Amino acid sequence: MFVECLPQYSSALDLISYAKWVAPGEGEGEILDFQIWPKRYNEYRNSGKPYVDFLYDHPALHGVDRQILLDCVPDGPPPGLPERYNLLAPHGISQGFHYPLAELMNKAEEQMGTYFLMHAPCHCYYSVPHWSASSVVEMAQAIKHADKFMTINSAPAVLASALRQNRLTYFLPQKEQWAQDNVAPWPGRVDVEL
C-alpha cells in the first residue's frame, strides 16, 4: 500500500511497515482519497459525526479494524529523556478550542507531579523541564515510553490512542462545537477538565 501526501507529512509513515510514501500525483492503481480538508470539510462539519466515524464511513473501509497499528516505534526512551518520566503535550495546530498553557501546566503537575513539556523544536524557554523530538518516530517513542502522559486533542493524542492502550493517559478534549474533532476513547484514557 502507498500513501500519497506532501513530503512534510511523509515521516509519519516511518511509524509503520505496511505502507510506503509516494509524492502527490505519483500513485498508481486504485486511489482512495481520505483527505477532509478543504474539499470535504463542510460535509464533515454538517454530518455531526466524530472525525473517525466520518472517515470510516468511506465504503472501502467498512468492516476495517479502527485500531491504529504503529509497528515501527522503538522501545525505551528517545534521546534526551531519562528512563522514567511523565510527559505533557500541550500544543497542537488544528484546535478550535484552546487551553491556556499555564493552566495545562498546573493540571499536569497536579495529576502527574514532575513532567517534561514536549514542544516543537525551537529556541524557547519554559519554566519546567522540556524536550522536543527531532522526528515523528522520536515523538511517538516518547509518548509510548512515558510513565504518565497528558495531551490535548492533537496528533500526540492520536499516537497515544495507538501506543498507550491500558496505560494512564490524561486527555483534555475539544469542547463546544469542536467536540466532534476528539479522538475516539481508548482503554487507559482519562478525560480531565481544567
What are these model-derived regions, one by one?
Residues 1-194:
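Catalytic machinery of carbohydrate-active enzymes
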